[in-house]
């Protein structure tokens, strides 16, 4: 039995959840999200709660996945998601101008990113980046793409890392 799939989702008053064919739309104070919802999983909405059920035992994993996706959509349109990145290294800095993010991270050229639709990028300081949006998947994907430009290396810890990420350090070579 899918334990995640059996959990009930509490729907805030400001949020509406509607199903249109195979798509599900969630509207809230921060915006609107639409995504494909597998027809093998059904849901029932009553008294500000959503209950999920599946048609067969073979759809056990899908049951929990669809429930988690809908829960993250509801959280996104009410509170939104924020990912914070930190740049560690001499001369590493980031500058955000509107939808454009420019990184100087030790290459001979600056690396530029265009923020996807619905994503805002801020640089509170030259060495920190904040990515905000209503879609958990898009925010996480964009943060991962930025981190992949210069992931933290294990010897000095230089690179782009998530704010709460722990970088496992290695010892360098020992002399004779």
Swiss-Prot record:
<dbReference type="GO" id="GO:0003735">
    <property type="term" value="F:structural constituent of ribosome"/>
</dbReference>
<keyword id="KW-0694">RNA-binding</keyword>
<dbReference type="InterPro" id="IPR000702">
    <property type="entry name" value="Ribosomal_uL6-like"/>
</dbReference>
<dbReference type="GO" id="GO:0019843">
    <property type="term" value="F:rRNA binding"/>
</dbReference>
<dbReference type="Pfam" id="PF00347">
    <property type="entry name" value="Ribosomal_L6"/>
</dbReference>
<dbReference type="GO" id="GO:0022625">
    <property type="term" value="C:cytosolic large ribosomal subunit"/>
</dbReference>
<keyword id="KW-0699">rRNA-binding</keyword>
<dbReference type="InterPro" id="IPR020040">
    <property type="entry name" value="Ribosomal_uL6_a/b-dom"/>
</dbReference>
<keyword id="KW-0687">Ribonucleoprotein</keyword>
<dbReference type="InterPro" id="IPR019906">
    <property type="entry name" value="Ribosomal_uL6_bac-type"/>
</dbReference>
<comment type="function">
    <text>This protein binds to the 23S rRNA, and is important in its secondary structure. It is located near the subunit interface in the base of the L7/L12 stalk, and near the tRNA binding site of the peptidyltransferase center.</text>
</comment>
<dbReference type="GO" id="GO:0002181">
    <property type="term" value="P:cytoplasmic translation"/>
</dbReference>
<keyword id="KW-0689">Ribosomal protein</keyword>
<comment type="subunit">
    <text>Part of the 50S ribosomal subunit.</text>
</comment>
<comment type="similarity">
    <text>Belongs to the universal ribosomal protein uL6 family.</text>
</comment>
<protein>
    <recommendedName>
        <fullName>Large ribosomal subunit protein uL6</fullName>
    </recommendedName>
</protein>
<dbReference type="InterPro" id="IPR002358">
    <property type="entry name" value="Ribosomal_uL6_CS"/>
</dbReference>
<dbReference type="InterPro" id="IPR036789">
    <property type="entry name" value="Ribosomal_uL6-like_a/b-dom_sf"/>
</dbReference>
């Amino acid at each position: 039995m899918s334990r995640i799939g059996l959990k009930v989702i509490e729907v805030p008053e400001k949020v509406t959840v509607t199903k249109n064919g195979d798509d599900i739309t969630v509207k809230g104070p921060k915006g609107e999200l639409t995504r494909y919802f597998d027809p093998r999983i059904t849901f029932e909405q009553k008294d500000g709660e959503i209950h999920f059920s599946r048609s067969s035992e073979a759809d056990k994993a899908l049951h929990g996945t669809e429930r988690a996706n809908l829960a993250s959509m509801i959280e996104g349109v009410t509170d939104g998601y924020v990912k914070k990145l930190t740049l560690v290294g001499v001369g590493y800095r980031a500058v955000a101008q509107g939808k454009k993010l420019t990184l100087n991270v030790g290459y001979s050229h600056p690396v530029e990113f265009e923020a996807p639709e619905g994503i805002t990028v801020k640089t509170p300081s030259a060495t920190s980046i904040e990515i905000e949006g209503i879609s958990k998947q898009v925010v996480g994907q964009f943060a991962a793409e930025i981190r992949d430009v210069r992931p933290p290396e294990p010897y000095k810890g230089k690179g782009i890392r998530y704010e709460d990420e722990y970088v496992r350090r290695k010892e360098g070579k020992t002399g004779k």
